[in-house]
Amino acid sequence: MSNILILDFGSQYTNVLAKKIRLLSVFCEVLTWNTPLEKILQISPSGLIFSGGPHSVYQENSPKVDKEIYNSNIPILGVCYGMQLIARDFGSEVQGGKSEFGYTPIVFYPSELFKGLVDQDAFHTEIRMSHCDSVVIPPKDFFVIASSQHCPIAAIECPEKKLFGLQFHPEVSDSQAVGDKILSNFVKHICQASETWKIETIEKQLIQSIKEKVGETERVLLGLSGGVDSSVLAVLLHNALGDRLSCVFVDTGLLRKNEVEEVKQQFSSLGLEILVVDASEKFFHDLSGIEDPEQKRKVIGAAFIEVFDEVSRNLDVQWLAQGTIYSDVIESAKSCDATQVIKSHHNVGGLPEKLNLKLLEPLRFLFKDEVRALGKVLGLPDVLISRHPFPGPGLGVRVLGEVRREYVEIVKNADSIFIEELKKANLYHKVSQAFAVFLPCKSVAVKGDCRHYGYTIALRAIESTDFMTACWPSLSREFLNRCSSRIINEIPEVCRVVYDISDKPPATIEWE
């Protein structure tokens, strides 16, 4: 298959870059920066991209590539750190200079990379910069094709070797129109990659892969959450394995309001029988006294595995299926040893090393929008496909600090009110995700002319195309007032409601 290969040097945007390329209907995969040249040549990609990263190329032991890769005749695009690496490998100097962050005016000059953007002499626009180091002089046989005020060498090219470098990130949403055009030029025009990445093809490949991996006799256990990922996975596995799939829904006590009954009803309508296991006592017991978010995630992951192990002995299953997707992997920083860890994901970083079941993750390299598209192909109803994401640890990471039953009930009711109001106002499908967070701090209020000491609820809503970057929506004063009034009046323990106005980055979507 004609494809684009990304060598990951640790950028948190690497998988956003991969998604952008897949949206061009071109297959893209990500490998670590130290992948042997022999393996890269065996893959025989149409093009290579060196990602950004947190290191400086002049640091000792900074990530490097085998320089023979430049003699492979494979077109290469370096992004940020990737551009600096190319420049250094060809004899240029990279220095820590004037940093640039945020929107920056830039000038593009004629280049194959900017085809359709630069008609004649130059094209003036704004892109988002995020760098501390800069290339001082262009390498021999390279030309400068973009400049900004504080970064005279913002992009370079060597047409003869088909080598290109960008000091900025074309994949981030802020510069979407320009960035998408640049990536399209590189992938389709320069690399001439084939458009073979289609969701219908993915469905067939995944079903075939599941059959080959599981074999003809072994059985699979799937822990349903009621979310998009596990719902799509359930139908996919059912199509591949039939009655050799056992679906278990674990009531952790950390679920959304009425979640258990809704999940039972939804999957019954899909022709799937599920076993409901009430393990809430265990989860609250195991979480008692634990305040650290990372530890909570690991405890919840371990508790899930213990429950599944116990169930599996009665069901005679050999595999545990999980709805892990690509963004889960990048959040847990497992795709590259140079990545800065943000948080562990329940499905990937929170699992104990010793697992008594073999792990099956068919959706591991699909993005959320690809999972939704797959769900449509599989015939899932819109009510499941368009549901907001819900974290694997559930409300355990929406109660800050120690998880107690009374705290969970408070945030569960507040969340239900918030979602209900979003649906009433026809806003639910206009935001990408929305939820309530319980803050374990009390503040003074006045209720019925009496002094009251109550908890605080934070409301969080975001708009995002990839869940790697996100912005907060400007919900109206009237809408937020309705939500606040209902929460404070209907939940006696709460006396204050705040609205989170933090983008990602710097904040993550979930508070923990």
Curated annotation (Swiss-Prot):
GO terms for molecular function: ATP binding; GMP synthase activity. InterPro entries: Class_I_gatase-like, GATASE, GMP_synth_C, GMP_synth_GATase, GMP_synthase, GMPS_ATP_PPase_dom, NAD/GMP_synthase, Rossmann-like_a/b/a_fold. It catalyses: XMP + L-glutamine + ATP + H2O = GMP + L-glutamate + AMP + diphosphate + 2 H(+). Residues 197-387 form the GMPS ATP-PPase domain. ATP binds at residues 225-231. Its EC number is 6.3.5.2. GO terms for cellular component: cytosol. Residues 3-196 form the Glutamine amidotransferase type-1 domain. Keywords: ATP-binding, Glutamine amidotransferase, GMP biosynthesis, Ligase, Nucleotide-binding, Purine biosynthesis. The active site is at 80 (nucleophile), 169, 171. Pathway: Purine metabolism; GMP biosynthesis; GMP from XMP (L-Gln route): step 1/1. The keyword Repeat does not apply. Homodimer. Catalyzes the synthesis of GMP from XMP. This is GMP synthase [glutamine-hydrolyzing]. It comes from Chlamydia caviae (strain ATCC VR-813 / DSM 19441 / 03DC25 / GPIC) (Chlamydophila caviae). The gene is guaA.
